[in-house]
Regions:
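Glycine-rich phosphate-binding loop used to anchor ATP phosphates in small-molecule kinases
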Residues: 53-106
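Conserved Walker
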Residues: 15
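A glycine- and Lys/Arg-enriched "phosphate-lid" helix/loop adjacent to the NTP-binding pocket
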Residues: 98-144, 148
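Conserved glycine(s) of the Walker
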Residues: 12
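NTP-dependent small-molecule kinase module
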Residues: 143-168
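Hydrophobic anchor at the beta1->P-loop junction of P-loop NTPases
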Residues: 5
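Conserved substrate/cofactor phosphate-moiety recognition/catalytic segment
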Residues: 18-61
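P-loop (Walker A) phosphate-binding loop of NTP-binding proteins
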Residues: 8
């Protein structure tokens, strides 16, 4: 079984992956860690700001890791924002039967009413080296992700209330 966890920044992808790892004992592949390893090692000239270019670049690698895990009968959790919404097109029906996908999406109302939680929990699993959280940008990104999930018929988990408090 391969579990894919996608979503915008600050939605809790890494936290969910951590909790699933603890529950099921599946290893976790963080696409962000892969990205930074490739960038810092000089394997790519892309930078962390090259989001539009990073998705196809990283997905080509992650896709083949997923296929290898399935072929080897290994379980794996993959988390990150670099999973394209048309990801299902890259797998045959046998592979798709062994993949679970969820996109974490915070509603506009949640982000407006709980922006303090978003900031407070941003380092609950990992230490971030990011600038200030832009709630308007997060709202825009989450709304775009919801529309894409609906367009592609993908499963999403809407975060609409104080669900994040469980991170404490």
């Amino acid at each position: 079984m391969v579990i894919l966890i996608s979503g915008a920044s600050h939605t809790g992808k890494t936290l969910l992956a951590q909790k699933l790892m603890e529950q099921y004992r599946y290893p976790v592949l963080s696409i962000d860690l892969l990205k930074m390893g490739l960038i810092r090692s000089g394997q790519t000239e892309l930078t962390p700001e090259d989001d539009n270019l990073l998705t196809p670049y990283l997905w080509g690698i992650v896709r083949e890791i997923i296929k290898t895990a399935i072929e080897n009968g290994q379980s794996l959790i993959v988390e990150g924002c670099y999973i394209p919404f048309d990801w299902e097109d890259d797998f045959d029906s046998d592979c798709l039967e062994q993949i679970e996908y969820v996109c974490l999406i915070m509603t506009k109302k949640y982000l407006e009413n709980h922006s303090d939680d978003v900031v407070r929990f941003e380092n609950v699993v990992e230490r971030r080296l990011l600038d200030e959280v832009n709630i308007d940008k997060l709202i825009e990104e989450n709304e775009r992700n919801l529309a894409s999930c609906q367009q592609y018929g993908l499963r999403c988990r809407l975060i609409a209330n104080r669900l994040r408090a469980e991170a404490q």
